[in-house]
């Protein structure tokens, strides 16, 4: 009778160890899942932050940290910004390296070479 109880206890202990070891092996996967879930939650909450500051403004109308910031640009800065935007629109370097080098025939065993 005692032998049967010992065998059952050892079987349950082995089963518990097997379950616990599988849980520990999948722990990095759970960390990755939780990190992705947190990133999605932060990304989803991003547009609502302006609404939060609006609510705070109703409670604390004189708080300087909640006032909208006005940024003054020098007269020539707007023209410079427009020129930079025009340059960035037509810039072929915005493409990934593989697409830029689509016609490249040189191939090195570690990857594509610059042509």
Curated annotation (Swiss-Prot):
Principal localisation: secreted
Pfam families per the UniProt record, alphabetical: Somatostatin (PF03002)
Keywords: Cleavage on pair of basic residues, Disulfide bond, Hormone, Secreted, Signal
BP-aspect Gene Ontology terms: regulation of cell migration
UniProt keyword annotation of Secreted present: yes
GO cellular component, one term: extracellular space
Signal sequence, renumbered to the chain: 1-18
Stored InterPro entries: Somatostatin (IPR004250), Somatostatin/Cortistatin_C (IPR018142)
GO MF: hormone activity
Compartment annotation: Secreted
Keyword Metal-binding: no
Propeptide, chain numbering: 19-87
Bridged cysteine pairs (disulfide): 104-115
UniProt superkingdom: Eukaryota
Function statement: Somatostatin inhibits the release of somatotropin.
Family: Belongs to the somatostatin family.
Name of the protein described by the UniProt record: Somatostatin-2
Native source species: Oncorhynchus mykiss (Rainbow trout)
Gene this chain is encoded by: sst2
């Amino acid at each position: 009778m005692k032998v049967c109880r010992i065998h059952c206890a050892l079987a349950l202990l082995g089963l518990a160890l097997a379950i616990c070891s599988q849980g520990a092996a999948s722990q990095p996967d759970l960390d990755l899942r939780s990190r992705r879930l947190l990133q999605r939650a932060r990304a989803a909450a991003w547009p609502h932050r302006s609404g939060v500051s609006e609510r705070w403004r109703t409670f604390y109308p004189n708080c300087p940290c909640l006032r909208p910031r006005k940024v003054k640009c020098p007269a020539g800065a707007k023209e410079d910004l427009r020129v930079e935007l025009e340059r960035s629109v037509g810039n072929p370097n915005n493409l990934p390296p593989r697409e830029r080098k689509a016609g490249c025939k040189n191939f090195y065993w570690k990857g594509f070479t610059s042509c």
